[in-house]
């Protein structure tokens, strides 16, 4: 049995570690298969330092969005909303719009299929790139991490950028929501 870590797992751990280092305290998880690397990394981080990241599991994405909004209002720090691919991300939109209008920092992280599996008619595939439109300050689509590529170097930088954008807005304005769509290849 191999103990090698998949690129998805390594990238997810680097990304979430940097978000926690930036000040993230809460992550609201709506689990699914495509987001499992991120979910497992979040769980590992919360187990390593129970005073650091708190992971809240919420099966319904719409409820998760508003729960995360409440946490961000209460703490004044961005809360991460994390879900799988398909129709799941669409349920975040009402909470993201509330966050934008209220100046509340939220970071929506959506797992997605790699680019070669998008738009091919697979079950529940949804075009997640730009899904939230004007409801977020910024929307970023990240290619699937692969072994031995420079994307690992960019995971921490991407996390820092998202935190900054959520706190100050994409154009230096007020806090609000941002979206990161991350493609993952199998093995997840």
Where are these regions (language model features)?
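N-terminal alpha/beta PP-like core and its mobile active-site loop of ThDP/TPP-dependent enzymes
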Residues: 2-188
């Amino acid at each position: 049995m191999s103990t090698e870590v998949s690129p998805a797992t390594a990238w997810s751990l680097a990304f979430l570690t940097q978000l926690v280092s930036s000040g993230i305290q809460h992550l609201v998880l709506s689990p699914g298969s495509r987001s499992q690397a991120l979910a497992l990394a979040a769980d590992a981080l919360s187990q390593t330092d129970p005073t650091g990241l708190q992971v809240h599991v919420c099966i319904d994405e719409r409820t998760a969005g508003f729960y995360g909004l409440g946490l961000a209002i209460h703490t004044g720090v961005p809360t991460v909303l994390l879900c799988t691919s398909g129709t799941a991300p669409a349920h975040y939109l009402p909470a993201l719009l509330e966050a934008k209008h209220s100046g509340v920092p939220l970071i929506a992280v959506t797992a997605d299929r790699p680019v070669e599996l998008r738009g091919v008619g697979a079950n529940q595939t949804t075009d997640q790139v730009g899904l939230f439109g004007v409801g977020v300050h910024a929307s970023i689509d990240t290619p699937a991490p692969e072994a031995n590529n420079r994307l690992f170097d960019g995971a921490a930088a991407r996390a820092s950028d998202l935190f900054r954008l959520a706190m100050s807005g994409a154009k230096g304005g007020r806090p609000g929501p941002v979206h990161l769509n991350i493609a993952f290849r199998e093995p997840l």
